[in-house]
Structure formats: structure tokens, C-alpha cells
Amino acid sequence: MTPAFADPMRIRRSLPILITLLVIAAAVAAVIVLRGQAPPEAARLLPGADGFLYVNLKWIRTLNGLSKLPPVSREPEYQKFVDETGFEFERDLDEAAFAMHYPENWGQGTAGSSPEARFSEIFVGKFDSTRLVSYLKKISASVESYRDFDIYNIPLEGRTVRVAVLSYDSVAVSNHPDPAVIRGVVDRSRKLASPFGGPALLRRFYRQVPLASEAFAILRVRPAEMNSFSGFSGWGLLFPRPAVAVLSARYIHALHLRADLFAENEADAKVIAERASAYVDIFHGAEGSIGVHGTDADVKAFFDSLKVEHSGDRAILTAKVPPGFINKILAGAPANAAAPGPQSVPGSQFVPGPQSGPGAQGAPAQKNPAPGIPKPAAPH
């Protein structure tokens, strides 16, 4: 028969083990929760910047409407890139994350010595590493070895585009003048599992991105300076002073669009909301002047879904795009509309092309957004 005093002794011996197991379980659970709340891994690799964009292209391809787009007619340079690497942006790119570096005179921008905006990118997709490396060696002026990684220095229009193959499915690109920027990406790729990683601006505002968003952007808004940068020139009409914009898109039976515009104070947020409401009123006014589509149920549902709210120091804009409206937009696109491919990925510099890249004397939208990769021609 076991002595009565044996049970307390057994408990005392087991208690430290139980406590240790509970602590380990709690730590594992905390890491899982934190990783679930953290930005996508591709975005966490990006350097500190003034704006971020992430797109899950693998998900976007599941939309039935995209299968109805006209076929892409490739320009010779892009076709050569595809032939040499086997990589097709419109087919093989699964995720894309971009960091936008504003010039220093844009309120302490992160572009370093560059007087123009610069970009850093992470591409995730189905790469043939052997063919890709062979291509990069061919177009590089030099190759830097850094912590067992090769960084390919590609001269392009008076600047250097740096490319590093991080893994079998990930590639980093940057045209930032400081080579330490892409070296930092390489360093972060070695400790990617950390849910605490990523640029400060991204970490701070990612919590405002709705759950399950397949595309989002987080941008510092500098209205006065952005007026000189094509693609952002109209923002000064909406923002009275600097702000932060959190834009997102997610698909739940319809495409839900949301913009959270964080102002410096409640008064500025109210002004933003009032100006945005004026734009929405213009859209509603245009609803009756678009011909036969004016009575279309899907189009009407979209216009009716446009809403503007004001809450504290933020203005909130929301809209819901029905699947039918998406299909109508795609079906009604002109024959010379841009095709889904490298040119539709803003800021991309991974592929060589005949036109300038982002930040080169103007807007990324006006020039080939992929300096280094030829864009495909318009669909026919």
C-alpha cells in the first residue's frame, strides 16, 4: 500500500514538468496567433519604405472573369525573356510585394541620394532557378557575393538594378542607390519565420487591413509633393495635409474595396470625408449618364454601395463590386487594353524593357513599370 505522503511528493515532482509544458504550449500558441496577424511573408521581407503594396496573384487568377481576357501578344523583348527563363508573369507569378521609397525632399523619404522615387520588390512564383540565374549572369555587369547569396548588379538607364535569388520560389529586386537595402532583404530571408519582422510602417498599419484581403496598400500620403508624381497628382485635392492611406481588396461573394485614410487629427479626417463624399456624389450623378448600363442591376448595385464614413481621425471609404459588374468591365474592355502581365504590376523592375522604370523622370504608369523586363504588347 502506497504511503499517504507519497502523493504530495509525486505532485511536487510532476508540477515543474507540467508548468514547463504549459509554458511551451502557450509560447507555440502565441507564435501561431502572431503569425496569423502578421503581414504576408513576402511583404515582411521588404525594407523600410514610405509605401507598400501586396497582391496575391494566385488568388486573382481564380476569378472566372480573368479567363475571358483577350490573349496577350508579346513584344519581342518579353518573348526573349520568357524563352530564356521559362517564366511568364501572367502564368507563373503567385505573389508580388512592393516597397516604394519616396525622395528625401518628400518629407524625409527613404530613397537615399536619389532625387526620384525608387522601388524594392519581392516576387514569389514558379521559377526555374537554373535558367533564371543564367539569364541574370548574362545581363549583369557584376555579381556580388553576400552571405552565400549572389547579388546581380544590372546597369539600366544610369542606375543599378540589384537582383538576388532568395530561394527556389522567391526573388528580390531593388533599384535603391544603397546596396545595403537588398543586403538587408537577404538578411531577413534567413529569419523569415519571425512574426515580428517587417518594416515599421507595415507592422503598424497592417492590423487595419481586413482579414483575408488578397491585395492591400499602405502609403504615406504627401499631397503637396505627390502632385509632381504622375498617378498621385490628384491626391492633393482629397488630402489637406500628410496622412496614411490603408487600401484593401478582398473577395467574399463580391469584390469588397476599402480605404482607411488616417489623418493627423479629427478635423483633417472630417475634411477628407467631406471631399470624398463630394466625389461619391459625382459618381452617383454619372450613374444616369452611362447609357444602357445606367439601368443595369450590377452597375446600380456598385454605385449604391459607395459609402463614406468619418470616425475620429480617419475617413473610411467602402464599395462592393458585384461579380456581374466585374465581368461586364472585362467584357467591355477595348481591344488595346492592358493585358495581365508585367506591365500590370506597378513598380516592377525585374524584367528588362525599352522604357524607363518607376521613378525615372515621371510616373510608373506612364513608363514600363518593369525596367529590365520587356512588357508584353497589348492583347488583340
Segments predicted by a language model, with ranges:
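Leucine-rich, highly hydrophobic segment in Treponema pallidum outer-membrane-associated proteins
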Residues: A26-V28, A38, A43-L45, Y206-A333
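Single conserved position on a long alpha-helix in the C-terminal lobe of the eukaryotic protein kinase
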Residues: L53, F89-G198, A259-F262, E309, ...
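N-terminal mature-domain "stem" immediately C-terminal to a signal peptide or N-terminal signal-anchor/transmembrane
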Residues: I32-P71, Y78, P374-P379
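Sec/Tat-exported extracytoplasmic proteins
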Residues: L57, R61, T85, E104, ...
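Hydrophobic membrane-insertion alpha-helices, especially the h-region
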Residues: P16-I32
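An internal, short helix-loop-strand segment that often contains or flanks glycine-aspartate motifs
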Residues: N64, K68-L93, V143-H253, A269, ...
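N-terminal Lys/Arg-rich, disordered targeting/topogenic segments
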Residues: M1-R12
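Short, conserved charged micro-motifs
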Residues: T62-N64, D128-S134, E266-A273
